[in-house]
A protein has these predicted regions:
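Catalytic active-site module of serine/aspartate enzymes centered on a nucleophile-bearing elbow/loop
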Residues: 292-326
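Glycine-rich phosphate-binding loop signature in dinucleotide/nucleotide-binding domains
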Residues: 21, 89-92, 326
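Active-site helix-initiating loop/hinge in glycosyltransferases
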Residues: 31, 74, 100, 310-311
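Conserved HGGG/HGGXW glycine-rich cap/lid loop of the alpha/beta-hydrolase fold
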Residues: 18-65
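A short loop-to-beta-strand scaffold at the N-terminal edge of the catalytic core in hydrolase folds
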Residues: 10-19
Length: 326
């Protein structure tokens, strides 16, 4: 199906944005390593429900502009991109829904621009205030000599070289090792006491297993589309979001101590690795204390990290029911 894209001038750059449907706008924000295409299963159901669907390629991705400076990928810059899209469309306000990195982007858009955001929904990554020490320092303390991907991503060039060597293989490994099937396999491996965790000198893809077949949620044509998007963009811009985490902490620490005021919805899969992001802590259990008006908190059984792609019908129903009651 042919889609309607507009190159939207916003915040000094141009953002490739899918805009379809009529009604109250809903902004969908993708994560890493993804694309507007990650929301392909949401477009028609939301249009039919009477919403204007707005799905940008976040700066650095796909056909959107790719600023060269690392600091150009801060939460403050990206949230300004989104508000600029609303300004361009002459929309007073909107609902916002984000997955993976798109979730923090959505949470902070609601905090930075409360008058522009009617409701906020996050998939996979709940809202939590920043710690009193910077994220990179915190992760070094938590993971010590073990490998942690965010620390691996910090130095420009190293992760790019590994991940861009064979884009299709990279994406296949990432998608298929973090979905429900991949996570079950990882849990089985973790029970094998002879297997040692990766040390901090490992690479990102090291230890990931090649799937025999693509999972049902990811068709060959889907993988091809994502692959072509990253052949266009490379990994530099997308990885810079991780490199701005300490900058985000500096700029937004005080703001992060506020609770989300808008009607809120949080959805994740029972097998999403983000639930176990911090050793010994289940993040889903703590969801609720950082929101003033959390209407929905859903854990979908047998779903991994790619929430709205692995369980589109369930996610669409939860989100549309939530929005209908606002």
């Amino acid at each position: 199906m042919r889609r309607n894209f507009i190159e939207v001038p916003t915040n000094g750059i141009k953002i490739n944005t899918l805009i379809e449907g009529e009604g109250k706008p809903v902004i969908f924000v993708h994560g890493w390593p993804e694309s507007w295409y990650s929301w392909r299963h949401q477009i028609e159901p939301f249009k039919k429900a009477g919403y204007k669907v707005i799905i940008p390629d976040i700066r650095g991705y796909g056909n959107s502009e790719k600023p060269k400076k690392v600091n150009s990928y801060s939460l403050r810059e990206i949230t300004n991109d989104l508000i600029g899209i609303l300004d361009f469309l002459k929309e007073k306000d909107a609902h916002i829904i984000g997955h993976d990195w798109g979730a923090p982007i959505s949470w902070y858009t609601s905090l930075l621009f409360p008058e522009r955001i009617l409701s906020v929904s996050g998939l996979s990554v709940p809202f939590n205030p920043f710690n009193e020490i910077s994220p990179v320092t915190l992760f070094k303390d938590l993971y010590k000599d073990a490998f942690f991907y965010i620390l691996y991503f910090q130095k420009v060039g190293i992760a790019e070289k590994e991940l861009e060597n064979n884009i299709k293989k990279t994406l296949r490994l990432i998608y298929c090792n973090s979905d429900s099937f991949g996570m079950k396999k990882m849990i089985d491996n973790a029970s094998n006491k002879n297997l040692k965790p990766k040390d901090k000198n490992s690479t990102f893809l090291e230890g990931m297993t090649e799937p025999e077949n693509l999972p049902k949620w990811l068709k060959e044509e889907d993988l091809e589309y994502f692959t072509n998007e990253f052949k266009k963009s490379g990994m530099y811009g997308p990885l810079n979001k991780y490199r701005c985490m300490d900058l985000d902490w500096q700029e937004l620490f005080k703001l992060s101590l506020n609770k989300i005021k808008q009607p809120s919805c949080f959805i994740t899969g029972s097998l999403d690795p983000v639930n176990f992001f911090i050793p010994g802590v289940n993040l889903f259990d703590s969801v609720g204390e950082n929101y003033e008006n959390l209407k929905v908190k859903e854990l979908i059984d047998d779903v991994g990290h790619w929430t709205q792609q692995e369980a589109p019908d369930q996610v669409n129903k939860i989100l549309l029911d939530f929005l209908e009651k606002i």
